[in-house]
């Protein structure tokens, strides 16, 4: 009875992979979860009830065929499970590690709603695809024929790389341009190693190179070439730069030293982990060692910052967030990990200013009451009069979200249209901007979001580019000449 299909959840409890003790994982940047054993993966995959309406798949941005690869895993058919997994996702082993499954597939699992505990979808996904790499099943997707057309991709993050792989598989010569010296974007420089070890990204980047994708690192559009120049070189150009401009806080003392942006802090930490020498880390300005650290914000980036500060040897780490725990945008799992590792959360508190002469010594804050819900359904923060207090701080990290850069100006293309939020305006069916042959995908279109949404957008953009290139090739010569 225990092995009966679709009833495994009745007899088998939810079990996550083994997690390293908090005291141990505070000491390094290695991933905190072990991989499932074969037996554990089979057991946990067998908990899937094979629902008639798979809400896990419905709530997956790339529409992964989750019940199918869970069933195949439970039957020991791992190579088939891998084939199903990679059919809808360019980076499944990455999503298995960093997706907030508690907000997506697992949070909407029918078994979770029935109080039996969700199927551990993300951990099984990681197991399937890590096994595929170990067994040599992962191969470059080379085209059956070359089309003789080239596409330029600006940005080597998840949206850009997903599109690059799809386009290369269709037969395009794909050139990826990125401002950094390594490909991967925020997968390399924004997400800490304890969530995503960089070797996992590096092997994917190499796989695309083996398929024929051509990389141009240290290439900045607007400096090394303008967007008009790239348009003349390629049949189509995809803008997938992400959003890197940090939201700031305007408060007394915000210009003091040692008040830094989250991405600057995380990028420095990741570069050091990769073996680079970074002056800002060496001189202590972007190094939490021995400091009282306060992180402002409640999203996943804030969680990355507090957990990084712990590993760098901070004396204390506090997270200041204006709403309560249940209303924070970050993953609840990440909050739990942070608490285990020694982070203190100060809920319903907002910064009002900073103390110090030349460098910050404290954060002046006020207590917050959550009032009536706004149009989005979230309760509106309201300041409690007379509730001021100060938190000691030698380093303040602002993790308040990201905004788009001024791309029309940066790319020397003033005709490129943006929305009122500064994101690129696209036709959401084709992903094309207002400029012929210029497409956009990922955060630069939807705003700061999840890696898995960037993958979906990149895949969709590749289809839009392919349809555009085909139509252009089939058009009458006179029209094409115009």
From Swiss-Prot:
EC number: 1.4.1.13
Assembly and binders: Aggregate of 4 catalytic active heterodimers, consisting of a large and a small subunit.
GO molecular function: 4 iron, 4 sulfur cluster binding; glutamate synthase (NADPH) activity; metal ion binding
NCBIfam families in the record: gltD_gamma_fam (TIGR01318)
Source superkingdom: Bacteria
Cofactor note: Binds 1 [4Fe-4S] cluster.
Span of domain 4Fe-4S ferredoxin-type: 39-72
Catalytic activity of the protein: 2 L-glutamate + NADP(+) = L-glutamine + 2-oxoglutarate + NADPH + H(+)
UniProt keyword annotation of Metal-binding present: yes
Leftover remarks: Glutamine binds to the large subunit and transfers the amido group to 2-oxo-glutamate that apparently binds to the small subunit.
InterPro entries: DPD_II (IPR028261), FAD/NAD-bd_sf (IPR036188), FAD/NAD-binding_dom (IPR023753), GltD-like (IPR006006), Helical_ferredxn (IPR009051)
Keyword Transmembrane helix found: no
Organism, as annotated: Azospirillum brasilense
Keywords: 4Fe-4S, Amino-acid biosynthesis, Glutamate biosynthesis, Iron, Iron-sulfur, Metal-binding, NADP, Oxidoreductase
Any one biological process term the GO annotation gives: L-glutamate biosynthetic process
Pathway: Amino-acid biosynthesis; L-glutamate biosynthesis via GLT pathway; L-glutamate from 2-oxoglutarate and L-glutamine (NADP(+) route): step 1/1; Energy metabolism; nitrogen metabolism
Entry binding sites for [4Fe-4S] cluster: 95, 99, 105, 109
Protein name: Glutamate synthase [NADPH] small chain
Obligatory cofactor(s): [4Fe-4S] cluster
């Amino acid at each position: 009875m225990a092995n009966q299909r679709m009833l495994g959840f009745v007899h088998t409890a939810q079990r996550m992979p083994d997690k390293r003790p908090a005291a141990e994982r505070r000491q390094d940047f290695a991933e905190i979860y072990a991989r499932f054993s074969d037996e554990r993966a089979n057991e946990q995959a067998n908990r899937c009830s094979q629902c008639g309406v798979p809400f896990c798949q419905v709530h997956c941005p790339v529409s992964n065929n989750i019940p199918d690869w869970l069933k195949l895993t439970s039957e020991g058919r791992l190579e088939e499970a891998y084939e199903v997994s990679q059919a809808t996702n360019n980076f499944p082993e990455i999503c298995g590690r960093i997706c907030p499954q508690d907000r997506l597939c697992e949070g909407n699992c029918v078994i979770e709603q029935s109080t039996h505990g969700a199927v551990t979808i993300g951990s099984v996904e990681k197991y399937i695809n890590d096994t595929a790499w170990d067994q040599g099943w992962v191969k470059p997707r080379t085209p059956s024929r070359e089309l003789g057309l080239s596409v330029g991709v600006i940005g080597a993050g998840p949206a850009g790389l997903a599109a690059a792989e799809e386009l290369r598989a269709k037969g395009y010569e794909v050139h990826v341009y990125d401002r950094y010296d390594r490909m991967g974007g925020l997968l390399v420089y924004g997400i800490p190693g304890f969530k995503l070890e960089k070797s996992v990204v590096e092997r994917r980047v190499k796989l695309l190179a083996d398929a024929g994708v051509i990389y141009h690192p240290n290439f900045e559009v607007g400096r090394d070439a303008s967007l008009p120049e790239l348009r003349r070189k390629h049949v189509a150009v995809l803008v997938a730069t992400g959003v890197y401009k940090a939201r700031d806080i305007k408060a007394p003392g915000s210009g003091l030293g040692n008040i830094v942006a989250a991405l600057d802090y995380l990028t420095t930490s990741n570069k050091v982990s990769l073996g680079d020498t970074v002056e800002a880390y060496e001189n202590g300005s972007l190094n939490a060692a021995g400091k009282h650290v306060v992180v402002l914000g409640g999203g996943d980036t804030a969680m990355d910052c507090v957990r990084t500060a712990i590993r760098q040897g901070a004396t204390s780490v506090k997270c200041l967030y204006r709403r309560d725990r249940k209303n924070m945008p970050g993953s609840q799992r990440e909050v739990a990990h942070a608490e285990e590792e020694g982070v203190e959360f100060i809920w319903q508190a907002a910064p009002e200013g900073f103390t110090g002469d030349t460098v910050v010594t404290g954060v002046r804050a006020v207590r917050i009451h959550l009032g009536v819900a706004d149009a989005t359904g979230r309760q509106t923060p309201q300041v409690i009069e007379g509730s001021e207090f100060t938190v000691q701080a030698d380093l303040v990290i602002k993790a308040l979200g990201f905004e788009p850069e001024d791309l029309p100006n940066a790319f020397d293309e003033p005709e490129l249209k943006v929305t009122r939020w500064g994101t690129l305006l696209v036709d959401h069916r084709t992903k094309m901007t207002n400029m012929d042959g210029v497409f956009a995908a990922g955060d630069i279109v939807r705003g700061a979001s999840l890696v898995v949404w960037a993958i979906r957008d990149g895949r969709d953009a590749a289809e839009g580019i392919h349809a555009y290139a085909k139509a252009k090739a089939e058009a009458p010569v006179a029209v094409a000449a115009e």
